[in-house]
């Protein structure tokens, strides 16, 4: 069963779901939140998480640069053509995975920046595995 991290905006005494992230996302692992409860999260913390995601994006970019240099070395190696093509295909698959990671991390960072902008004027709350919180579910962390 997949677990989720939920973000809510408080409107009067109601909590409106504004985003959710499954356990398989980087956002899920980067945010500190209570289980089956919610806590207030501020603009600064949201922007800090967004910056950590951007750092992951920068790491992926540096890995792509490294792999591109490796591709140049593979093409000039003395291996058979078939071996070279196998190695090149393998490296290109890894590059494609990093490119997907970059797009995903960028999207998550933009989403968190948007939520951080909301936090300037609204109370934003976060929690694991709590889809319909009430006032009594608020904890201080």
Where are these regions (language model features)?
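Acidic (Asp/Glu-rich) sequence patches and key acidic residues
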Residues: 1-141
